[in-house]
Amino acid sequence: MLDLLYVIPREEFVPQQHRALAFSDLELPLEKGTKAGAGERMWQPKLEARVLQELALKRTDRVLEVGTGSGYLTALMAYRAAEVCSVEIRPALAAFGRGNLERHGADNVTLEVGDAARGWARHAPYDAIVLTGSTPILPQGFLDQLAAGGRLFAVVGEAPAMQARLVTCTAPGASSSVDLFETVLRPLANAEQPQRFRF
């Protein structure tokens, strides 16, 4: 799976000033390269590789990505899957990701601007869903939009206690999940919040 990180040149998706660090074990900032100003970051290469490994994408899979960012993970998934719908809430970041994807001929990607923090029913059902930001709780909308046998990767919880979770749709309305590892990830914009008790 790590070989795929070299098939699609990662450095070409990184803002110019950070290209020397493209394969470093770091989250690289995107905001200066995109003027999005939101403090967004590229995932570490090892996290990208782990997500691809866990999702085990097939040529027939339809994928939803929530949070396009640089477009690199989008391109990796598009290389493996039939089609990828990627939704980015920040127009400037969407433009940066779109430019990167177009330069690399990712013609099986649909990139849309919008708020998909609770799901994106437009192209559902999906065989795989990836949330590139964390969410305190996993919205039911994503589970409802998984096809039978579909897999969802999300980082769930609040800092400092977050879990990378893989959810599999076992039947309509039913799913199983496994917590893979602990990590900390920036939250999705407008992520669903748990109900808080007030006294």
Which role does the model predict for each range below?
Residues 52, 56-175:
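Conserved nucleotide-cofactor-binding alpha/beta core module
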Residues 1-64, 72-75, 80, 93-103, ...:
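Class I SAM-dependent transferase core
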